[in-house]
Amino acid sequence: TTYEMDQKLGTEYHKRFTEYMKFVQENDLTVDGAMTDPKGDRSLSPSRQEDPDMYMHVVEVREDGIVVRGAKAHQTGAVNSHEHLIMPTVAMKEEDKDYAISFAVPSDAEGVFMVYGRQSCDTRKMEENADMDLGNAQYGGHEALVVFDNVFVPNERVFMCREYEFAGMMVERFAGYHRQSYGGCKVGVGDVLIGAAALAADYNGVPKANHIKDKLIEMIHLNETLYACGIACSAEGEKMPAGNYQINLLLANVCKQNITRMPYEIARLAEDIAGGLMAVSYTHLRAHETSQDL
């Protein structure tokens, strides 16, 4: 999108972004691609919100950069990220131009702070001898609300500032890549769930029962359909004028549409196969008083 802006407007956004991308790659940095705003009243545009901070916006333009306010919500991996790359979250009109901004800041920039989202079993990980309940201790998932309280962004890290007519293009392209990636990451989780369901059937002594096999086959079919969608939108992409590879946006949307449906059915079938199961903690499995009974 920065390339198209430069071609039409004579700006230097694409050069800035290319230099930033090199900086990220050369320093092996993790970047939080942040698009989702709190949004407030969804029936109103950004500029018509009662609280102007419901969408990220520029509050001051200086000779050497801009000052921004707002927040980005549901940011997976934000606390683990070195940088935050901010993008608009909706297509915009001229009245919303102060909200049409894209920029990058380090996580420790002055005025940036994060509110960590609670997990349903997060305190369980703090129990003594939790071990197995920790999951992947080094790469555990999390989400955070990233707040920007009058944060200064130098010009070299600004990639869009009030070019409202390009906000929709940026949103559509980023969303396409995001939806394409779901054809891989969600399918990987599905593989694990299918394996766990098959193991539960073995434990229950019914791996050869026809209705169990039918359900496992359906789970595999649904999961591989999602994978096929991810492959399709990736393979059907094309080279863009800027030199980057753009996945097929229509097929990426099909991929995400199926992702919003099929994993729930896969999980429902897993519940049918597993039956009632009380999942105790690893601490109880190892405790002398309870281990033998469990």
Task: Identify the meaning behind each predicted range.
Residues Y227-T260, Y264-Y282:
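C-terminal helix-coil-helix/basic helical segment that borders enzyme active sites and/or dimer interfaces
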Residues T283-T290:
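Conserved small/polar residues in nucleotide/adenosyl-binding loops
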Residues G10, L134-A137, R179-G183, V187, ...:
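Hydrophobic alpha-helical scaffolding
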Residues S181-K239:
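Extended amphipathic alpha-helical segments enriched in small hydrophobics
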Residues K22-Q25, V67, G188-D191, G195, ...:
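Generic structural signal for well-ordered, non-transmembrane alpha-helical segments
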Residues P38-C185:
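FAD-binding core of flavoproteins
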Residues D293-L294:
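N-terminal low-complexity segments that are often proline-rich with Ser/Thr-Pro
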Residues T1-V31, E83:
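Internal helix-loop-helix
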